[in-house]
Design a protein with these regions (language model features):
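Walker B catalytic acidic pair
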Residues: 94-95
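Conserved Walker B catalytic segment
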Residues: 103-118
Length: 224
């Protein structure tokens, strides 16, 4: 059935992309009456598992791709196996990052546009890893019922930079930010003993942290 082949092909491409595999095959298991995915694992063994045993992230992404491919196949049966490549359109996806590991969030938009190259995707997200995978011109910030352009470049920016510049969210909890402010106030007031106490407290809470390393250096320099 051409429609089913198109759906299975899209699912296979999706599985290959999110797992790094290159030979996934989606198959119907007559015995269990379930859909399985067969692939070669890192040890070279051929594996076969039911799709419903995959993680939520895998299942939600593959199900999304399968749903899009199925709708394309039904609407454009004349395209046969090329339906995913030839069908154009606009698709809206709410919370595209839902259930996805951060590593997948970074590539989900790229993967969707590779599998469906003639589709324009309009997605919502709260994940910095999704936002920093596209250029500033492709981002619209919704704030107080207004659609605003991204206030800064997004592509390639680190997650903390996205939180600060685009989402306007502090990258640390308020109580930690307050301790940072107390440290710098103590430095400004030349209360170095107090600054050292605050910094020691932050060391206990945060452990190895590049910002704390810089603060230790600053405190040492101030006391010279």
């Amino acid at each position: 059935v051409p429609e089913l082949e198109a759906v299975f092909s899209a699912m296979e491409q999706c599985y290959n992309r999110i797992t790094g595999s290159n030979d996934a095959k989606i198959q119907y298991n007559i015995g269990t009456k379930e859909i399985d995915v067969a692939y070669t694992d890192a040890q070279g063994m051929r594996m076969r598992i039911p799709l419903n045993q995959l993680s939520d992230g895998y299942k939600s992404t593959i199900s999304l791709v399968a749903d899009i491919a199925y709708r394309m196949a039904v609407l454009n049966p004349q395209c046969l196996g090329e339906v995913c490549k030839k069908t154009d359109g606009i698709i809206l996806i709410d919370e595209v990052d839902l259930h996805l590991h951060p590593a997948w969030q970074k590539q989900i938009l790229h993967d969707l546009t590779e599998i469906f190259p003639n589709v324009q995707f309009v997605v919502s997200t709260h994940a910095p890893e999704v936002i920093n995978s596209v250029a500033r011109e492709q981002v619209v910030v919704l704030e107080n019922y207004q659609a605003l352009p991204a206030p800064a470049e997004t592509y390639g920016k680190d997650a903390n930079g996205i939180l600060r510049a685009i989402m306007r969210v502090k990258e640390r909890p308020d109580d930690i930010m307050e301790k940072f402010e107390q440290f710098y106030h103590a430095i400004d007031a030349q209360e170095y003993t107090l600054a050292a106490e605050i910094l020691g407290n932050l060391d206990e809470i945060l452990g190895d942290d590049p910002d704390l390393t810089a603060m230790h250096i600053q405190l040492d320099l101030e006391q010279m």
